[in-house]
Amino acid sequence: MARIAGVNIPDNKHAVISLTYIFGVGRHTAKSILAAVGIGPTTKIRELDDAQLDAIRAEVAKVPTEGDLRREISMNIKRLMDLGCYRGLRHRRSLPVRGQRTKTNARTRKGPRKPIKK
């Protein structure tokens, strides 16, 4: 198994699919990374030599991935909460942020039902 950006990449899969195991790299980004390096998308990771893997590592390093991306996302949410805007309030109350209905549904975001005490 090759190790790219701190993630073990499966050897037996195509390069495009293998790169999507990295948080922050989807299929489109994986295709653009491979195009920049000059590797075909159907090439398997085990067929690549060390120089090609190093080139892929260098390209992946240019994209925010893994811990940096998770930190950036959490800081964006924290910024919204500190501003006190509507989206920040919805995050703070653990309710849906993007305008979904909450009278029914939204159980995943709200958590299990709380019984009414009499």
Curated annotation (Swiss-Prot):
Keywords, sorted A to Z: Ribonucleoprotein, Ribosomal protein, RNA-binding, rRNA-binding, tRNA-binding
Spans annotated as Disordered: 92-118
Please give the GO cellular component terms listed in this UniProt entry. Answer: cytosol; small ribosomal subunit
Enumerate the InterPro entries for this protein: Rbsml_uS13_C, Ribosomal_uS13, Ribosomal_uS13-like_H2TH, Ribosomal_uS13_bac-type, Ribosomal_uS13_CS
Q: Which GO terms describe its biological process?
A: translation
What are the boundaries of the signal sequence?
none
Pfam families assigned to the protein according to its UniProt record, in alphabetical order: Ribosomal_S13 (PF00416)
Molecular function GO terms recorded: rRNA binding; structural constituent of ribosome; tRNA binding
Assembly with partners or alone: Part of the 30S ribosomal subunit. Forms a loose heterodimer with protein S19. Forms two bridges to the 50S subunit in the 70S ribosome.
Give the protein's function: Located at the top of the head of the 30S subunit, it contacts several helices of the 16S rRNA. In the 70S ribosome it contacts the 23S rRNA (bridge B1a) and protein L5 of the 50S subunit (bridge B1b), connecting the 2 subunits; these bridges are implicated in subunit movement. Contacts the tRNAs in the A and P-sites.
Question: Which family does the record assign?
Answer: Belongs to the universal ribosomal protein uS13 family.
- The name on file for this protein is Small ribosomal subunit protein uS13
Q: Which gene name does the record give?
A: rpsM
